[in-house]
Amino acid sequence: MESTLGAGIAMAEALQNQLPWLENVWLWVTFLGDPKSLFLFYFPAAYYASRRVGIAVLWISLITEWLNLVFKWFLFGDRPFWWVHESGYYSQAPAQVHQFPSSCETGPGSPSGHCMITGAALWPIMTAVSSQMATRAHSRWVRVIPSLAYCTFLLAVGLSRVFLLAHFPHQVLAGLITGAVLGWLMTPQVPMERELSFYGLTSLALLLGASLIYWTLFTLGLDLSWSINLASKWCERPEWVHLDSRPFASLSRDSGAALGLGIALHSPCYAQVRRAHLGYGQKLVCLVLAMGLLGPLNWLGYPPQISLFYIFNFLKYTLWPCLVLALVPWLVHMFSAQEAPPIRSS
């Protein structure tokens, strides 16, 4: 295993030193492959293009992120940015590698969350675009473009994670395979407009299930804060260690989004726009308005106390689906209805 990890460091060193002009590209790719970007960009864009696909993206994101958290607790994967110090690799073969603000994530490293969660959540988008192109394009090469774009993007995300010293190549590969399999399995099974209690119980099950696993492992003598301690110890700058990279931050996000999805689907605003037909221009306005609201909400400051941070994160992502599914379309629909000229009866 040591040789495999050493080869991963060598690969990161090659990416950083042989292709330094690609640094900004890798930073952008890892940002676009971040699970938080699924909530901020891909979910709203997919929803306003297709209601079914948008809900699938959100649902698969929150379930897969929860599974990724549990997998990481059991697999205990090191991250390159601390392993090079803890293992003594530097003293044996000094590597010319350096960290970035995105390197210092505090959870275990295996499997890669960027690859697993994003790969699963983008699967319904890829399959929807593929089916559309299959009905309109006669060329076989044109029909495979969505699949090629999906694979190319995820490969780039994986390389960016190696470049940043956030993951080893085998962790990236595990995330890519697991994400694709989960996306394939879950896309046909996404619940659409179930009763509110279903989403409330899902949110509760995510919280209680992860907490039960955590305390069971803790009772058995496993210290699940080991990765937080190592990240804090070996990160070059303390300000690069962010609260929102902690394992329970993703749990609060997922449980909040599950509850928010149920609230949105059963809100009066959603009931009014559910049967309404929004034109392409209205959908574009919805997307712009949603991004204008979600952006500031995403970049709000966090409470310094860890418990308050988790509560704040839960409430923020509960509000997220309510804005995208209900409030924004309702506002656009209401203003469009007011501006429409009255129909004169003959």
UniProtKB/Swiss-Prot annotation:
<keyword id="KW-0378">Hydrolase</keyword>
<dbReference type="GO" id="GO:0004346">
    <property type="term" value="F:glucose-6-phosphatase activity"/>
</dbReference>
<feature type="transmembrane region" description="Helical">
    <location>
        <begin position="198"/>
        <end position="218"/>
    </location>
</feature>
<keyword id="KW-1133">Transmembrane helix</keyword>
<feature type="transmembrane region" description="Helical">
    <location>
        <begin position="308"/>
        <end position="328"/>
    </location>
</feature>
<feature type="transmembrane region" description="Helical">
    <location>
        <begin position="55"/>
        <end position="75"/>
    </location>
</feature>
<keyword id="KW-0472">Membrane</keyword>
<feature type="transmembrane region" description="Helical">
    <location>
        <begin position="284"/>
        <end position="304"/>
    </location>
</feature>
<dbReference type="InterPro" id="IPR036938">
    <property type="entry name" value="P_Acid_Pase_2/haloperoxi_sf"/>
</dbReference>
<feature type="transmembrane region" description="Helical">
    <location>
        <begin position="168"/>
        <end position="186"/>
    </location>
</feature>
<comment type="similarity">
    <text>Belongs to the glucose-6-phosphatase family.</text>
</comment>
<feature type="transmembrane region" description="Helical">
    <location>
        <begin position="25"/>
        <end position="45"/>
    </location>
</feature>
<feature type="topological domain" description="Cytoplasmic">
    <location>
        <begin position="187"/>
        <end position="197"/>
    </location>
</feature>
<feature type="binding site">
    <location>
        <position position="79"/>
    </location>
    <ligand>
        <name>substrate</name>
    </ligand>
</feature>
<protein>
    <recommendedName>
        <fullName>Glucose-6-phosphatase 3</fullName>
        <ecNumber>3.1.3.9</ecNumber>
    </recommendedName>
</protein>
<feature type="topological domain" description="Lumenal">
    <location>
        <begin position="76"/>
        <end position="108"/>
    </location>
</feature>
<dbReference type="InterPro" id="IPR000326">
    <property type="entry name" value="P_Acid_Pase_2/haloperoxidase"/>
</dbReference>
<dbReference type="Pfam" id="PF01569">
    <property type="entry name" value="PAP2"/>
</dbReference>
<feature type="binding site">
    <location>
        <position position="161"/>
    </location>
    <ligand>
        <name>substrate</name>
    </ligand>
</feature>
<dbReference type="GO" id="GO:0006094">
    <property type="term" value="P:gluconeogenesis"/>
</dbReference>
<keyword id="KW-0312">Gluconeogenesis</keyword>
<feature type="topological domain" description="Cytoplasmic">
    <location>
        <begin position="329"/>
        <end position="346"/>
    </location>
</feature>
<dbReference type="GO" id="GO:0051156">
    <property type="term" value="P:glucose 6-phosphate metabolic process"/>
</dbReference>
<feature type="topological domain" description="Cytoplasmic">
    <location>
        <begin position="130"/>
        <end position="140"/>
    </location>
</feature>
<feature type="active site" description="Nucleophile">
    <location>
        <position position="167"/>
    </location>
</feature>
<comment type="function">
    <text>Hydrolyzes glucose-6-phosphate to glucose in the endoplasmic reticulum. May form with the glucose-6-phosphate transporter (SLC37A4/G6PT) a ubiquitously expressed complex responsible for glucose production through glycogenolysis and gluconeogenesis. Probably required for normal neutrophil function.</text>
</comment>
<dbReference type="GO" id="GO:0015760">
    <property type="term" value="P:glucose-6-phosphate transport"/>
</dbReference>
<feature type="transmembrane region" description="Helical">
    <location>
        <begin position="109"/>
        <end position="129"/>
    </location>
</feature>
<feature type="active site" description="Proton donor">
    <location>
        <position position="114"/>
    </location>
</feature>
<feature type="transmembrane region" description="Helical">
    <location>
        <begin position="141"/>
        <end position="162"/>
    </location>
</feature>
<feature type="topological domain" description="Lumenal">
    <location>
        <begin position="305"/>
        <end position="307"/>
    </location>
</feature>
<feature type="transmembrane region" description="Helical">
    <location>
        <begin position="255"/>
        <end position="273"/>
    </location>
</feature>
<comment type="pathway">
    <text>Carbohydrate biosynthesis; gluconeogenesis.</text>
</comment>
<feature type="topological domain" description="Lumenal">
    <location>
        <begin position="219"/>
        <end position="254"/>
    </location>
</feature>
<keyword id="KW-0812">Transmembrane</keyword>
<feature type="topological domain" description="Lumenal">
    <location>
        <begin position="1"/>
        <end position="24"/>
    </location>
</feature>
<dbReference type="GO" id="GO:0016020">
    <property type="term" value="C:membrane"/>
</dbReference>
<dbReference type="InterPro" id="IPR016275">
    <property type="entry name" value="Glucose-6-phosphatase"/>
</dbReference>
<feature type="topological domain" description="Lumenal">
    <location>
        <begin position="163"/>
        <end position="167"/>
    </location>
</feature>
<feature type="topological domain" description="Cytoplasmic">
    <location>
        <begin position="46"/>
        <end position="54"/>
    </location>
</feature>
<dbReference type="GO" id="GO:0005789">
    <property type="term" value="C:endoplasmic reticulum membrane"/>
</dbReference>
<keyword id="KW-0256">Endoplasmic reticulum</keyword>
